[in-house]
Swiss-Prot record:
The gene is Cenpa. InterPro entries: Histone-fold, Histone_H2A/H2B/H3, Histone_H3/CENP-A. Residues 1-34 are annotated as: Disordered. GO terms for molecular function: DNA binding; protein heterodimerization activity; structural constituent of chromatin. This is Histone H3-like centromeric protein A. Component of centromeric nucleosomes, where DNA is wrapped around a histone octamer core. The octamer contains two molecules each of H2A, H2B, CENPA and H4 assembled in one CENPA-H4 heterotetramer and two H2A-H2B heterodimers. CENPA modulates the DNA-binding characteristics of nucleosomes so that protruding DNA ends have higher flexibility than in nucleosomes containing conventional histone H3. Inhibits binding of histone H1 to nucleosomes, since histone H1 binds preferentially to rigid DNA linkers that protrude from nucleosomes.
Amino acid sequence: MGPRRKPQTPRRRPSSPAPGPSRQSSSVGSQTLRRRQKFMWLKEIKTLQKSTDLLFRKKPFSMVVREICEKFSRGVDFWWQAQALLALQEAAEAFLIHLFEDAYLLSLHAGRVTLFPKDIQLTRRIRGFEGGLP
């Protein structure tokens, strides 16, 4: 039989900083972290704007399309070609991107930076019933 290990005693955690004004170094560190996170967001936005890739994954989108098709065709199952699903997905993404662009313009017009549901609702109301792409 090999040597036995001694049971480890729980170690004490380091004491938390005293309440009161924080030190200058911690605020500087949090500012650089925020700045780094901001640049990461901006970098992600720029890469997404440059790319022409699809934003939705293909499998979940095809499942939603099949479910909607089954609902409106009263249980009749249709076969979908891959090219047809791809064309439908590109059209759906273009529609949503254009909708969000217009809704964001409305939020900027209202003097806000945050996009609210009421901006999207107003965009759809301005566009009308069949407010597709221009």
